[in-house]
From Swiss-Prot:
InterPro entries per UniProt: Glyco_trans_2-like, Nucleotide-diphossugar_trans
One Gene Ontology MF term: glycosyltransferase activity
Species assigned in the record: Haloferax volcanii (strain ATCC 29605 / DSM 3757 / JCM 8879 / NBRC 14742 / NCIMB 2012 / VKM B-1768 / DS2) (Halobacterium volcanii)
Effect of inactivating the gene: Impaired formation of the tetrasaccharide present at 'Asn-532' of S-layer glycoprotein Csg. No effect on 'Asn-47' and 'Asn-117' glycosylation of S-layer glycoprotein Csg.
Name of the protein in question: Low-salt glycan biosynthesis hexosyltransferase Agl10
Gene Ontology biological process terms, A to Z: protein glycosylation; S-layer organization
Key words of the record: Glycosyltransferase, Transferase
Top-level division of the source organism's lineage: Archaea
Enzyme class at the top of the EC tree: transferase
Entry-linked Pfam families: Glycos_transf_2 (PF00535)
Nucleotide-binding listed as a keyword: no
Amino acid sequence: MPYCLYDNTCKVQQTMLDDLSIIIVNYKSEEDIKNLYSRISGVAEFVVVDNSSSSELRQWCSHDDIHYIDSGGNHGYSGGNNMGIRYSLDELNRESVLVLNPDLEINKEDIRELYTIHQSTNYSIISPRILNREGIPVNESPTPEGTLFRSIGLLPALPGKEHNLKPVDHAHGSCMMISESVFEQIGYLNESFFMYYEEIEFCYRARRENINIGQCQVVDAIHNQPVDQTRFESSYQVYLDFRNRFLASNSIFSKSIDRIQYTTLSILISGWMVVRMLFEKKIEYIAPAIFGALHGIQNRTGKPERM
């Protein structure tokens, strides 16, 4: 069972955004969380969900304006964030949440800008432009996949641009500001995925309900994804990416014809990605990709013990 800790005696700065909580999930990323907190503390209350039950992190959180939740195990991106989101909405009575990855670089002013735009538009899910370490955008939109799905009616047309927001089919999972009304309308993140593709599936569900999603063109954030992943870590990611793409069919679409169309297109997209692996000589990822696709079609969910 999750364990929650919060020191109600701490003094919260008056400049905090009272209707917003920042959700961060920890899995062996304590130092990243401390660094992120040092940059943006005081802008909104923090909710840290600990998927690795770190006694060090728990002790550190008790000395600051941070709500600490021990999740009791590794529940992945979706499970951990859902705990934090539910706590923020139900216990803290927040109207919006900001889901952040621990390895994200963003400052207080940018969070305030996101919040101001979020509150003043009819976009219920927004994210900044996400850059890699070299300053190259990694969440450019519209994506070929989203364009393809919209062309055959699996997703509605994108709305018009509003203020500094570019309409997109999905936000980047490392930084998403989401209104409470979204969860009331479509539910929470899909916990059957464990990791990867969950923000895309969540946003596709939102888009199917005509919920607007935007990328803020005046706010940038840097996602410090590791460049030294082991072969196993990369293969694990490939497996989950391919598997969860197919798992998304049942949760996004209620009509069988839509599921068939989505699955057919996903097979074509996956095949194209495997061909790219061949050309790029990434042979070691082909087996995880194929097994991931097969297991997704077979509806195998949750955290895989091995590929």
